[in-house]
Amino acid sequence: MCIRDSFYSYTPAFENSSVEDLEITRLVLTLVCLISVFALVFRANSSASKNSEGWGALKYPQLAWGMLAIFTYVGVEVTIQSNLGELLKADIGEGINAIGLPVLDEAQSAKYIALYWGGLMIGRWTGSIGAFDISESLKKILLFITPFIAFGVVIAVNAFSNPLTFSEIGIFSLLIVIQIIGFYLAKDNALKIMAIFSLLGVIAMLIGIFGSGEIALFAFLTGGLFCSIMWPCIFSLSITGLGKYTSQGSSFLVMMILGGAIIPPLQGKLADIFGMITSYLSLIHI
């Protein structure tokens, strides 16, 4: 209901007594959606723990936490790039944006958004190596080669419209090396992978928020690299031990991609109130 009402709230400004009132209404409805999701999941799991009959997969706490993790992960993944274009083109004075770079229009910022999604692809390709039944030595070689092959695809695609500079390629290559080190340290352990890349993601967002220039820009872009492996890790940890309820639990997890529709507008409203850079702090808390 709150999602429906939030869409219905988007009416022409002249039909409302105050545009400010409309913005507050949208923010409240979005917060209600967010709180409702968390409350319903916790309530269902709490009730199931007392009397599991009829609750199916929801009686397992790892699934409940996994549902919330998928919700927030997808929300963060979508949010970083959804508002990145606005961050790069918003002029705070003298043709400079909030991270201290020259203001970029949509065409100029498109390659950075593409690079963010490319980072997601790089991480997914690299993470998939663990699914193959190959020797450990070959796996280690592929862990190093695969991300750069994927990056080559990203570079080639951008070359047709807005090519990356040698400097940008070099910086992102160094970030890929950090990701590779993370994979080596985790040693195919889903819990370790999630812990390492969650920490790296938080560090990247902090650098983006409090840094400036290309350092801040590429810190935000690195969010794609570090978010990329979260889905399979959360999924596998959440359905462990569900037995006959594995299929049902998987369905619940997929439903929680709803976070990608709730968290981005919430950050957008926070950006309107506190500023775009400050609004990215919400991603760290999530």
Where does each model-flagged region fall?
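A late C-terminal transmembrane helix in Major Facilitator Superfamily
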Residues: K244-A271
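Extracytoplasmic gate region of multi-pass secondary transporters
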Residues: S6-T11, P61-I113
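C-terminal transmembrane helical hairpin of 12-TM major facilitator-type secondary transporters
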Residues: L142-M230
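A membrane-interface helix-boundary motif in multi-pass transporters
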Residues: S9-L29, K269-I284
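Conserved small/polar residues in nucleotide/adenosyl-binding loops
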Residues: M1-D5, I284-I286
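Helix-to-loop junctions at the C-terminal end of transmembrane segments
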Residues: G123-S137, I181-N189
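Loop-to-transmembrane helix entry
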Residues: G95-Y116, F144, T165-E168, S247-S251
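Intracellular juxtamembrane helix-capping segments at the cytosolic ends
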Residues: I229-G243
